[in-house]
Amino acid sequence: MVYETGNETVDDAVQRALDGERLDRTDGLALLAQPVDELAAGADLLRRHFSDGTVDACSIVNAKAGNCAEDCGFCAQSAHFDTGIDTYGFLDPEDILDAAKRAEADGAQRFGIVVAEKGVSKEKRPDEWDDVIRAIRLVRDETDVEVDASLGVLTEEEAEILAAEGLNHYNHNIETSRRYFSEIVNTHSFDDRLKTLHRAKAAGMDLCAGVILGMGETPADRVDAAIELQEVGVSSLPVNILNPVEGTPIGDREAATISRTELIKTIAVYRFLHPEARVRLTGGREVNLDPDEQHLPFEAGADGLLTGDYLTTDGQTPADDIEIIERAGLEPNREANTFDPESVKARHRSPAAETASNANRTNATTETDD
């Protein structure tokens, strides 16, 4: 035995993962039942073995907001629900580049262009598609961040074009388990999401696909979602925690239906089931974890985060995120974007500091007022 927590189930799973065995649903459920401290310790060992000792930060821009025809029950941007958010069409590619440059200055290693719609269609909206391609090229050519995108469903042709343009990761979350998906979404199927992931991967892009925890799913659903992602093969697994938005079908609850301990255990199990992926803590962490708790997932297998603001809700500053990473005894990834963490922390102590997403909101408001 390479490492012993004193917990036979955890120690056995650690050894098998180190030996290259892919753990299955039975393993995931058994691990989820173990005490959190021992489970987190085992997951942390796997992170140290398979990862590089850094936490990888990504940032996003809400490049097209609201009026989405899909009915995802958690989403403030669905046209089916009255949530009061600002809506706007696809941003000018130069504005997206500006947001990417701010993300670069804030230490992001990758920058995601995100749209609120079922899919950016080359055939049905060619002008918008051309703007997407132009934005990808600008970020690719004029920054050091890796350019990612979340553009909804893709055809095979669209996936091949995006891959040829150098898109690094394609994000398309599965949100939850196959069993629970229809409780949250009715306008498309779980398999629709999987088809897009398979097309993106077949075209040569890496996959970023994950879940939202605390929507009423069971612990078994959380494991089942991770098993589905094993079959797809993801290199980045974002873990969102529900931040209920008033006006959505699940917006009337006060908080996500997951405790801090359950969250930590789920992240640890995801490390066991996806030992070589970036397990990335993303939306909802600030409202579901106290400031002095946010380092805990990074002591339980997590090694990535989304920094700055989210699509329609505020995040915390990149300086705060760097301090959380350091509190966990880790350091920010600087492989693609060799930034100075101390400079980021110093700059964001100023009240005038502006993250990429904050700046985008200014752009969006300006467009709405025209």
UniProtKB/Swiss-Prot annotation:
Residue pairs linked by disulfide bridges in the UniProt entry: none
Annotated binding of [2Fe-2S] cluster, by residue: 208, 280
Pathway of action: Cofactor biosynthesis; biotin biosynthesis; biotin from 7,8-diaminononanoate: step 2/2
Cofactor descriptive note: Binds 1 [4Fe-4S] cluster. The cluster is coordinated with 3 cysteines and an exchangeable S-adenosyl-L-methionine.
Protein name per the record: Biotin synthase
UniProt: [4Fe-4S] cluster binding residues: 68, 72, 75
Reactions performed catalytically: (4R,5S)-dethiobiotin + (sulfur carrier)-SH + 2 reduced [2Fe-2S]-[ferredoxin] + 2 S-adenosyl-L-methionine = (sulfur carrier)-H + biotin + 2 5'-deoxyadenosine + 2 L-methionine + 2 oxidized [2Fe-2S]-[ferredoxin]
Classification via Gene3D superfamilies: Aldolase class I
GO terms under biological process: biotin biosynthetic process
Lineage, highest ranks first: Archaea, Methanobacteriati, Methanobacteriota, Stenosarchaea group, Halobacteria
Gene name of the encoded protein: bioB
